[in-house]
Every structure is written in structure tokens, then in C-alpha cells.
């Protein structure tokens, strides 16, 4: 990122070279994105309604190749298990509506204590939808005293202890504050073996960050956004995964339901074949425009789409996914990512630019197998907003979360080792020199 104008930001009245380390919150715009979007805009301009079915990226099908590419290059799944559609929260609602099937005995959802608020709101709404009390339905995993991250040794006992009550497990692939990478394969196995329940994952901070193997890990479902590590633009189109073992039978004509009554004597109709919630784009494309009013579900994950994908957002994400393909996929990017984050950790902990131990605490696990690209530090003896603003004045863009967490992420697609070194110098200046 060469130049960024700060003139709209209070107290910063100059332009300079920027050190951008905030890809965990918003990825940068690829150089070719504007060119490609303008090309697609011209397609709409020149073809009008015909652009639904013709042109380089027909609007009605703009998600199809994108879904295939994301399945192959980003999450390692079968093509029929991935759909690029809607956004993370909507996709989560659609999948939770299918997989959260509370009964009198099993009605609880296992989550982390510091779950991302949006995910909490989704789960809370489904608990209430089924007529249950939220206070009775959440089992929360908490780190040990004076620790930031969850230990596998503490997750398994909690699953075993509550296996008779757990109806669903929902966790993040990578925790948004600490940057901790969860062992998705192992935890999914535990959920299946002991709680005998579906296990779902929020991959907002994992997709485009680390290699994923969703099919092979036997994950039931997952959702993600695309504006962070995938650089898909603000409010980018999201994605969902549903393992093929949960797919409805081919030729299924709409949802099939069973009726049961929960412990509050409320009658619930649950879909046992395909999505619980459907829409215009859940219908198979071959007969969608016959307008019969009879739902004919699309195959696999495509049945979990709701409406026509946004063409321009699909175009923006197409550019970004093609860049990842040109790099050889996530394994190559991860190799550089590990080196960048390891280098940053070395600089702030053991080099001549090391931060004083009483000025910070490293929150993210030091083991590269237990983290993604993000490195989070807890700042002591200084207001975190002041730290953020002082870094901003030096041209460093990262972000913070209250009460005192500074989140920094070297991105292999656009950060260099020199960037990381210059960042460490700025951190040293702000944290060490200011507090001396």
C-alpha cells in the first residue's frame, strides 16, 4: 500500500507511506479489481437485462465458478459442498435453522465464552425461536485463570461432561481477538463421538489465512466472510459449506418436515431433507424460471442459497480468488505467512527492537501451528486507544479491541519482511520510548 490520505482523520494532516497490518479486519483492494468491475459494469450497461445470462460474467451464474474455485483452492471441499452466497450472518442463520434440532434432553449449544457477538445473536435467536430460555442453553468454554486461549485439554472434558445436553457445537476456526487456531478436525471428532451432534465453524478469520480441509475433517457445516483475508471488498459476498453426508436426495422437491413438540408444548416442524429456509435461488436453475411455485431444490450446497448473487461483489471476489490461484493456493501463502508472523514475534520479543516485558503480554500462541497470521498483544500501563493513535501518526494501520488488545497481521499477499521490521521499530518507539 503506497499512499493513504489521512486528511479526514483528526490530528493527522499529512500523507506518507503506510504500513498496513489490518488484513484481519479489512483486506486491501487488488490492483485489478477496479479494472474488472468496470468491465462488468460495461457488460451491464451494454447488455441490460441480457446481462443476466450473457457476457463474461452473467449475473445469474456469477457465483457458480466462484463456488467451484473456493471449494478447490480455499477450503478443500467437494464442489457440491460449497456455495458463495449472501453473507456470513445470513448463511449462519440458514445452516443453524437446519442443524439446531433441540429436544427435551439435548438442547444446549457449546460455544466459547468470548464468541463473536454476531454469532451469539444468531444462536440466541434460534434458541428463542424454538421456545427455549437462552440462559439454560449455552455452555461456554473459558480459558484458565490468567490465560487467554482455550486448551484442548479443557475442551474435551467439557464435551464429555455435557454430552447428554449438547445439541450443537459452534466455534471459530481462528479466534478473532487472540488469533488462536483451533484444532477443527479433532474437536469435530470429539463432538461426533461423545455428544453425537453436528459441529459448525465460523471461518471468518480462517478462510484465506490458513489451509483448510473441510471435507476431509468431516466438518458438518461452516460459514465465512470474504472481506478480510480474501480481499473481496467491504461487505463482500460470503460463503457456506455443508458436508455431502448432509445433502438431500437428488431430485428432492422441496423440504420435507416432521412434527414434534418441545418441553414448552410448542409444536415445531423440522426439515429432515435439505434446507429449512429456502428462497428463489434454492430452486434448481434448470426450472427456476418456469415459475411453477413448486420448490425443486438445487443440488447440494446450492440449495442453501436464497437469492440472486450480487454481481459486482462476485466480480470483486473473483479477482481475489484468481490471485490466490496464481500463487499456487493456500499452502504456498501459508508458508510465507508463518515466516512473516514468526519474524514479527522474534522482533518484538528477542531482538534489539524487543518490547519491554512489563509493557505488553503476547496473547496469541507462540506455536505457529496454533495460530494464523494474526499476532495480538495485550498492552499494559498505557491506554490502548492512545497506542493505536500514536501508531497511526507513524503511518501504521492495525486495530485494537477493548480493553487492551492490539491486533497486528502480516499478510503474505502484500506485506514484506521489510514492512514487518519497520512495524517493529514503530512499536518499539510507541511502547518503549513513550513509557520510559
Curated annotation (Swiss-Prot):
Protein name: Kynureninase
N6-(pyridoxal phosphate)lysine: residues carrying this PTM: 228
Record key words, sorted: Cytoplasm, Hydrolase, Pyridine nucleotide biosynthesis, Pyridoxal phosphate
Record GO terms (molecular function): kynureninase activity; pyridoxal phosphate binding
Primary localization class, coarse: cytoplasm
GO cellular component terms listed in the entry, alphabetical order: cytoplasm
Taxonomic lineage of the native organism: Eukaryota, Metazoa, Spiralia, Lophotrochozoa, Platyhelminthes
Gene Ontology terms describing biological process: 'de novo' NAD biosynthetic process from L-tryptophan; anthranilate metabolic process; L-kynurenine catabolic process; L-tryptophan catabolic process to kynurenine; quinolinate biosynthetic process
Subcellular location(s) per record: Cytoplasm
Family: Belongs to the kynureninase family.
Amino acid at each position: 500500500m503506497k499512499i493513504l490520505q489521512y486528511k479526514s482523520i483528526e490530528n493527522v494532516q499529512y500523507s506518507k507511506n503506510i504500513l498496513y497490518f489490518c488484513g484481519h479486519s479489512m483486506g486491501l483492494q487488488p490492483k485489478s479489481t477496479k479494472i474488472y468491475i468496470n468491465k462488468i459494469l460495461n457488460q451491464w450497461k451494454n447488455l441490460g437485462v441480457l446481462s443476466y445470462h450473457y457476457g463474461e460474467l452473467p449475473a445469474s451464474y456469477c457465483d457458480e465458478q466462484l463456488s467451484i474455485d473456493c471449494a478447490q483452492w480455499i477450503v478443500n471441499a467437494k464442489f457440491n459442498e460449497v456455495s458463495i452466497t449472501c453473507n456470513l450472518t445470513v448463511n449462519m442463520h440458514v445452516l443453524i435453522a437446519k442443524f439446531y434440532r433441540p429436544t427435551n434432553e439435548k438442547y444446549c449449544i457449546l460455544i466459547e465464552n468470548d464468541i463473536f457477538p454476531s454469532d451469539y445473536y444468531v444462536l440466541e435467536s434460534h434458541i428463542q425461536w424454538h421456545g427455549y430460555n437462552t440462559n439454560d442453553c449455552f455452555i461456554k468454554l473459558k480459558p484458565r485463570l490468567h490465560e487467554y486461549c482455550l486448551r484442548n485439554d479443557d475442551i474435551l472434558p467439557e464435551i464429555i461432561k455435557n454430552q447428554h445436553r449438547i445439541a450443537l457445537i459452534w466455534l471459530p476456526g481462528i479466534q478473532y481477538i487472540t488469533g488462536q487456531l483451533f484444532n477443527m478436525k479433532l474437536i469435530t471428532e470429539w463432538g461426533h463421538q461423545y455428544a453425537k451432534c453436528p459441529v459448525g465453524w465460523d471461518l471468518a478469520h480462517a478462510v484465506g489465512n490458513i489451509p483448510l480441509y473441510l471435507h476431509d475433517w468431516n466438518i458438518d457445516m461452516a460459514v465465512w466472510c470474504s472481506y478480510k483475508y480474501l480481499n473481496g471488498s467491504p461487505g463482500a459476498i460470503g460463503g457456506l459449506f455443508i458436508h455431502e453426508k448432509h445433502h438431500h436426495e437428488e431430485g428432492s422437491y422441496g423440504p420435507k418436515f416432521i412434527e414434534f413438540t418441545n418441553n414448552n408444548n410448542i409444536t415445531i416442524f423440522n426439515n429432515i431433507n435439505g434446507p429449512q429456509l429456502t428462497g428463489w435461488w434454492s430452486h434448481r436453475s434448470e426450472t427456476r424460471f418456469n415459475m411453477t411455485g413448486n420448490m425443486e431444490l438445487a443440488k447440494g450446497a446450492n440449495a442453501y442459497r436464497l437469492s440472486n448473487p450480487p454481481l459486482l461483489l462476485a466480480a470483486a471476489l473473483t479477482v481475489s480468488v484468481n490471485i490466490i490461484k496464481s500463487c499456487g493456493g493456500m499452502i504456498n501463502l501459508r508458508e510465507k505467512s508463518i515466516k512473516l508472523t514468526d519474524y514479527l514475534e522474534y522482533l518484538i520479543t528477542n531482538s534489539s527492537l524487543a518490547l519491554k516485558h512489563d509493557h505488553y503480554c503476547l496473547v496469541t500462541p507462540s506455536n505457529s501451528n496454533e495460530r494464523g497470521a494474526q499476532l495480538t498483544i495485550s498492552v499494559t500501563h498505557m491506554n490502548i486507544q492512545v497506542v493505536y493513535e500514536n501508531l497511526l501518526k507513524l503511518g501504521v494501520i492495525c486495530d485494537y479491541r477493548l480493553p487492551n488488545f492490539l491486533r497486528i497481521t502480516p499478510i503474505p499477499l502484500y506485506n514484506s519482511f521489510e514492512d514487518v521490521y519497520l512495524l517493529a521499530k514503530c512499536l518499539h518507539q510507541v511502547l518503549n520510548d513513550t513509557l520510559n
